[in-house]
Amino acid sequence: MTISFVPIDVRSSDEADFVEFLMGNVFPLHVHSHPSVDQISTAIDRGRYDGDDHAALWIDDDIRGRLGVVILEDLADGGTMFDLRLAEIHRGQGLGTPVLRAITTRVFSALPNVNRFEGQTREDNLAMRRTFQRAGFVTEAHYREAWPADGGAVFGSVAYAILRRDWQSGTTTLLDWDDFPGVG
């Protein structure tokens, strides 16, 4: 399995395929599980997928073909974030960890200003939480009732990150959750 990333031209040559991908798959654990054409068009117009601070990339595999998309955010910042969306037909096959590791390698290799790579997921997205851990990311925060979902439900959000130095060394620097003396 060889994973590669192809920049998406969301305003021109790739726009139709990009919109079709987002509309043709359901993302039940994302804020917008089934985005409309209007929502996608508005996001494109507002620069959510391109520009100096954002990038949209197709995730391709030499055997399986197109696996999904990743949106990179805060590229000019030292803490780049991502939104990963695998196509429905590729979920549940153990692809999340190798894909996330490949994305991490791409970010740290291509963006020398990035010191940390971050992502968040809903508290009930156990598959993605395991993926984060297997890819060397560390749980950094739990935000209670911070993730709105379709239908008005609100879930907790769990934040994960990997540091450049951990990626380079292949180690994991854990947090000291009991670092506030005198409390407990």
Enumerate the predicted regions with their spans:
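A general structural signal for well-ordered secondary-structure junctions
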Residues: 27-28, 50, 113-114
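Active-site rim helix/loop that mediates acceptor-substrate recognition in acyltransferases
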Residues: 33-55
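Helix-loop element at the rim of GNAT/NAT acetyltransferase active sites that forms part
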Residues: 20-35
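Acyl-donor (CoA/ACP) binding surface of acyl/acetyltransferases
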Residues: 1-24, 58-184
